[in-house]
Amino acid sequence: MSGLQVLLVAGTHGNEINGPWLLDQWSQTPELINTHGVGVVPVIGNPEALALGRRYLDCDLNRSFRLDLLRSPSILDREVVRAKQLLSFFGPEGSTPCQIVIDLHSTTSAMGSTLVVYGRRSVDLALAALIQARLGLPIYLHDGDDDQQGFLVERWPCGLVIEIGPVPQGLLKARIIEQTRLAVQACLEALSSVASGSPTYPDEFVVHSHLGSLDLPRDALGQPAACVHPSLQGRDWQPLQMGAPLFLWPDGEVFRFEGRDSPIPVFINEAAYVEKHIAMSLTCREVCPLPEQWQGALQQLVDC
């Protein structure tokens, strides 16, 4: 086994408590998660926010890893300071350097168990493809959105997000915890297979590429004027057809989808995205080949 160190982060958002609870239970019962010999460094991303049950204190930690924020000595938001600390401790050049990061999240949307990859780095996609081949998890490929930047996993050589839902904020739910545990274990098992030189990569894998986001209709004061239509709520991953109901006004009027390409909505009515003016994101399904160069890039990173 190589000297690979994997940073396992939970509680990046302080009101997502299932991941932190799993890490706490794991510390008391090590056999809860089989690491398959991979070195794992568990850490709570935003412990102050977790203690208060809040998503964040000053700003979203998972948008605080932009280079301009990290390089500015004058920005003292607690999440930006925490982002710098995490990199100082666990970044590639940190005191306890980690090459790969797995960031655990939960969502109020009906996303099931999902892998989220930011950008199109070959090592991220190779790892996600390995995990998808083991568990069949969908991959949400989020790139090309200038309004959403500064994600934690982008600052490590390789990283992905495990997103599990639906679960209300601040609520422990056994099914969510078990899904998180299984996904973490699959990640570590996949990395162990790479480290031992025995990975079984698929010839191709499926991603859902980010197209953009839709907001709720809003009034002149910027307040929501309609809500997500009840027939759409909970239907993440189901293609939108022409004329499908999107939003419902208080008087019963329905706003319908007018596109023709049957995009696939994700993170429908996510509670945390209200402040970001996102009612849902739209994706398109892509079947991607898995080049040998990507596999080699992940192998090289793991062997370092």
Curated annotation (Swiss-Prot):
A GO term from the CC aspect: cytosol
Catalytic reaction(s) noted: an N-acyl-L-aspartate + H2O = a carboxylate + L-aspartate
CDD domains given in the database record: M14_ASPA
Chain residues that bind Zn(2+): 13, 16, 105
Enzyme nomenclature, EC number: 3.5.1.15
MF terms in GO: aspartoacylase activity; hydrolase activity, acting on ester bonds; zinc ion binding
Required cofactor(s): Zn(2+)
InterPro entries from the UniProt entry: AspA/AstE_fam (IPR050178), Aspartoacylase (IPR016708), AstE_AspA_cat (IPR055438), Aste_AspA_hybrid_dom (IPR007036)
Details of cofactor binding: Binds 1 zinc ion per subunit.
Enzyme class (EC, first level): hydrolase
Keywords assigned: Hydrolase, Metal-binding, Zinc
Residues involved in substrate binding: 55, 62-63, 163, 273
Family statement: Belongs to the AspA/AstE family. Aspartoacylase subfamily.
NCBIfam families assigned: PRK02259.1
HAMAP family: Aspartoacylase
Name of protein: Probable aspartoacylase
